[in-house]
């Protein structure tokens, strides 16, 4: 466990929350905007560096507040430019954050939980069990750390982080309030100013919270589908037993229709050799998604030890994609990035204190550091 100070962590407060905080300590609400800019635009964690605040206010803030992000354990850089940070959160567990540069975009993949309770059979994170929800400060803190690493100001045109996907460790909708607060900061011009179309939340299908999400925030939605029929999805994504496909897809349709503006649902489908990659599975997907505005992202399986699954051949992947194309769907195949530093989709594991198995040991599915020679470890921890 990481020791707490009892002070209010301003890093995870939205603008309205920060305004209320300043009112509670007898200060004007406009101070919230000043402090948010220092924190998120410039990566400042020292009140003394906030030059437009008077000394008395800086001293008051030092007495009752702090700006504290997760602790960086390691930062690895892949041969393809992908970066991965392993960060330690207050529970003592480690989670992972991945930055993927591609063309003129920079996508940050953010974790929402330490471990995951959903136990999807092909995902290394799920093999750890669940430890804890991340706080709002720990979720947005991953963006804060990455942005500081690049030394860029979010408002600039040449920003490093253009997109954020809640597709890291954990199920975001099972940490609803903290994830929503973090996404609000991401989209706030006083935070990171990221367009609502460029913030995406991925869910395995927590149906009640999909409806709640549509009421409070406008972000893009991705569904981790991975199977085109009930029996197979029950096997691969166990939450399907609680929220079957007809109920789940109806909720997704409601969400997309509320957004309007020609928004579509992203379907994520991990291809597993001999399991869900056959022509009949593609045909079933076409029928299943016939009346849903969507785009399909095929993800060839990224191996990890003892998974029991294999990546399909390139021919099998192309065949699956071609069938979906002929069925009228917009289909892409995700390029595997960061595989040499275990940063590819489905490989994020961190190090999680195993509470679901009621023991006091640590699960370490892999070493926190990459094997020698597999990646360049960054020396700059700022």
From Swiss-Prot:
Specifically methylates position 2 of adenine 2503 in 23S rRNA and position 2 of adenine 37 in tRNAs. m2A2503 modification seems to play a crucial role in the proofreading step occurring at the peptidyl transferase center and thus would serve to optimize ribosomal fidelity. It comes from Stutzerimonas stutzeri (strain A1501) (Pseudomonas stutzeri). This is Dual-specificity RNA methyltransferase RlmN. Disulfide bonds join 109-345. Its cofactor is [4Fe-4S] cluster. PROSITE patterns: RADICAL_SAM (PS51918). Residues 102-342 form the Radical SAM core domain. One of its GO terms (biological process) is rRNA base methylation. The active site is at 96 (proton acceptor), 345 (s-methylcysteine intermediate). Reaction proceeds by a ping-pong mechanism involving intermediate methylation of a conserved cysteine residue. Belongs to the radical SAM superfamily. RlmN family. S-adenosyl-L-methionine binds at residues 170-171, 202, 224-226, 302. GO terms for cellular component: cytoplasm. It is an enzyme of class 2 (transferase). NCBIfam families: rRNA_mod_RlmN. Gene3D superfamilies: 1.10.150.530, Aldolase class I. [4Fe-4S] cluster binds at residues 116, 120, 123. One of its GO terms (molecular function) is tRNA binding. It catalyses: adenosine(2503) in 23S rRNA + 2 reduced [2Fe-2S]-[ferredoxin] + 2 S-adenosyl-L-methionine = 2-methyladenosine(2503) in 23S rRNA + 5'-deoxyadenosine + L-methionine + 2 oxidized [2Fe-2S]-[ferredoxin] + S-adenosyl-L-homocysteine; adenosine(37) in tRNA + 2 reduced [2Fe-2S]-[ferredoxin] + 2 S-adenosyl-L-methionine = 2-methyladenosine(37) in tRNA + 5'-deoxyadenosine + L-methionine + 2 oxidized [2Fe-2S]-[ferredoxin] + S-adenosyl-L-homocysteine. Binds 1 [4Fe-4S] cluster. The cluster is coordinated with 3 cysteines and an exchangeable S-adenosyl-L-methionine. Keywords: 4Fe-4S, Cytoplasm, Disulfide bond, Iron, Iron-sulfur, Metal-binding, Methyltransferase, rRNA processing, S-adenosyl-L-methionine, Transferase, tRNA processing. It is found in: Cytoplasm. Its EC number is 2.1.1.192.
